[in-house]
């Protein structure tokens, strides 16, 4: 088997997103050097409580990490060291919150700039708590000089919204003022900044502020009093902020917006000509919140018909409308402090390499290492920009999300119920021991299954709980045009690169890596519909449930979940199965069996040989223009 494409992907992902420039040696870090940097950061963080026992745990996890038996937080690889100590939110892959307070938008922008994905609820009972907006005075003008920091960029949005908020928001001195933003302090595009990154320049920020201001003006135009912010407008504010973050090229700006099942504007947010009229909406997944016991069979049938016909809306089953989920829906959270103040809560993720779990012993070793890494990460809660409620929420449950990628590479080991339970219990036990040494809380929930797009690329496994796509396929990866790795690939292999249709600012390209799967792999075609859902249900029952410390959860119904994408072969059968088993599911992405072509530049696109095309469609198929265009 030729693994050149997969190896190129792995190296590209590591050097593009995680390896740091070493000034001393005049080159980029190796894998082992990057891991050492992260683990030494943990040693520095916990120096005051270091004991021989704690060091033995750290050393154990470090070796497993270097062996790629596990991965720690990918944000730690990216930012580990002084950058992460400056902004400890950078430890976490994703965050969630209710959109229900004046500071939400600037805190959201801050987290996106830190590299965190954001899940946010615009359900009516949350949006109703936002301050109302009103017209500003035409002749009252104030200047805000934007500091060249992520706090400064976030503050710019705080100032803009405060100028409209009836209560003055978080910057009451700007209440009712026309705001002139001065970008002179922001370094020009391409200038070197800390961590080996390059400055994005002010254009993306300026554009997002202008677009958000236009939305606010549209709300107050023709009014004499204060008006409420609609759900769709609050959603678009975050989408424009996401575009500004993406222009910086630090990472993908991942978001998910959760809304009410009767919110017609949100239900239609990605219908019609949205791709032309509102391209910023491509930055999010949108999901309707469905309370399991309140969902009728008829309502479910209508939702599934829309999903089948239009691919929208996404949906999330929940026990409580106060619960929130990260963009990939594998972490369930309740981002409210004990005194009722809303804030953010975080996904604290580690990854087990299922491709290396060839027996119970190797699986248990990975479970132990994943738990150690996750517990070390859980202590990073010095959030200087965010509210104290966020710190309280994060420290209270001290969540872990020990995930497995490559389930289908060793299914006999990983899907054995006894092994799943044993592994989950090991994660809980190790977490309890290490948390005690660190002086932090034991985790309320410890196990999850994330989609593992980037992690599977680095480790060379199938993604998450999914099978290999096909024997041969193109793996389409979104990359920023300003990245050095992107420039090298474009120069040496230009036929692999094309402009991204998902980048409204033209800052991204798509690189198509040719991949040949390992012989004997379980492919997507072997895991259609209900068969794949059976695997998801089993992982939820044995891996997730047994990794939950129910007595430590702030709500006994809170659970982590299995992130999954199901290729549907029989829509009626899948509809019935999901409804009858909704207790075991949260979010499910449904893709038609023609899904490769349903979305432009889909992440995976199967490649057929000429003989396979003839076998499937007949001799004359080679002269069919549609197939020829598709093959090209």
Language model features with spans:
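Extended catalytic cores of very large enzyme megasubunits
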Residues: 1-632
């Amino acid at each position: 088997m030729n693994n050149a494409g997969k190896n190129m992907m792995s190296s590209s992902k590591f050097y593009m997103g995680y390896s740091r420039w070493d000034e001393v040696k005049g080159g980029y870090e190796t894998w082992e050097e990057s891991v050492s940097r992260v683990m030494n950061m943990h040693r520095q963080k916990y120096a005051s409580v270091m004991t021989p026992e704690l060091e033995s745990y750290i050393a154990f996890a470090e070796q497993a990490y270097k062996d790629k038996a596990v991965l720690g937080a990918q944000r730690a690889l990216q930012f580990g060291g002084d950058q992460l100590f400056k902004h400890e939110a950078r430890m976490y892959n994703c965050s969630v919150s209710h959109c229900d307070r004046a500071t939400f938008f600037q805190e959201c922008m801050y987290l996106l700039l830190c590299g965190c994905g954001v899940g946010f609820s615009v359900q009516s009972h949350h949006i109703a708590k936002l301050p109302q907006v009103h017209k500003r005075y035409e002749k009252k003008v104030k200047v805000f000089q934007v500091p060249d920091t992520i706090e400064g960029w976030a503050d710019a949005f705080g100032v803009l919204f405060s100028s409209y908020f009836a209560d003055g928001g978080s910057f009451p001195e700007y209440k009712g003022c026309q705001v002139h933003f001065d970008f002179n302090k922001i370094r020009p595009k391409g200038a070197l900044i800390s961590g080996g990154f390059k400055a994005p320049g002010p254009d993306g920020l300026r554009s997002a502020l202008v677009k958000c201001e236009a939305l606010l003006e549209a709300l107050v135009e023709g009014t004499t009093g204060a008006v409420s912010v609609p759900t769709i407008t609050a959603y678009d504010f975050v989408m424009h902020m996401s575009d500004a973050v993406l222009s910086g090229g630090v990472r993908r700006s991942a978001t998910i917006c959760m809304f009410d099942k009767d919110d017609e504007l949100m239900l239609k947010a990605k219908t019609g000509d949205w791709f032309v009229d509102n391209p910023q909406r491509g930055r999010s997944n949108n999901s309707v919140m469905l309370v399991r016991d309140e969902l009728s069979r008829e309502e479910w049938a209508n939702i599934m018909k829309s999903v089948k016909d239009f691919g929208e809306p996404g949906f999330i089953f929940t026990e409580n409308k106060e619960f929130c989920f990260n963009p990939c829906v594998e972490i369930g959270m309740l981002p409210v402090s004990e005194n009722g103040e809303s804030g953010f809560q975080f996904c604290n993720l580690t990854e087990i390499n299922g491709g290396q779990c060839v027996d119970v012993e190797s699986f248990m070793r990975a479970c132990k290492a994943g738990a150690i890494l996750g517990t070390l990460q859980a202590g990073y809660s010095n959030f200087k920009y965010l509210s104290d409620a966020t710190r309280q929420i994060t420290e209270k449950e001290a969540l872990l999300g020990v995930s497995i990628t490559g389930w289908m590479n060793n299914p006999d080991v990983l899907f054995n119920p006894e092994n799943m339970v044993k592994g989950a219990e090991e994660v809980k036990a190790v977490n309890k021991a290490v948390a005690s040494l660190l002086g932090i809380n034991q985790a309320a929930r410890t196990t999850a299954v994330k989609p593992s797009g980037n992690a599977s690329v680095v480790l060379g496994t199938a993604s998450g709980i999914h099978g290999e796509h096909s024997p041969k396929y193109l793996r389409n990866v979104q990359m920023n045009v300003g990245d050095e790795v992107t420039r090298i690939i474009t120069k040496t292999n230009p036929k692999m690169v094309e402009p991204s249709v998902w980048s409204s600012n033209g800052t991204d390209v798509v690189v198509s890596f040719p991949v040949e799967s390992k012989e004997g792999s379980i492919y997507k075609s072997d895991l259609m519909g209900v068969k794949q859902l059976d695997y998801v249900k089993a992982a939820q029952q044995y891996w997730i449930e047994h990794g939950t410390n129910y007595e430590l959860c702030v709500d006994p119904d809170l659970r982590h979940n299995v992130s999954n994408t199901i290729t549907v072969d029989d829509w009626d059968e899948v509809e019935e199965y999901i409804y009858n088993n909704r207790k075991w599911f949260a979010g499910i992405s449904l893709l038609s069996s023609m899904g490769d072509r349903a979305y432009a530049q889909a992440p995976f696109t199967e490649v057929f040989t000429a003989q396979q095309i003839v076998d499937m469609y007949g001799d004359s198929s080679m002269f069919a223009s549609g197939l020829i265009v598709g093959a090209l």
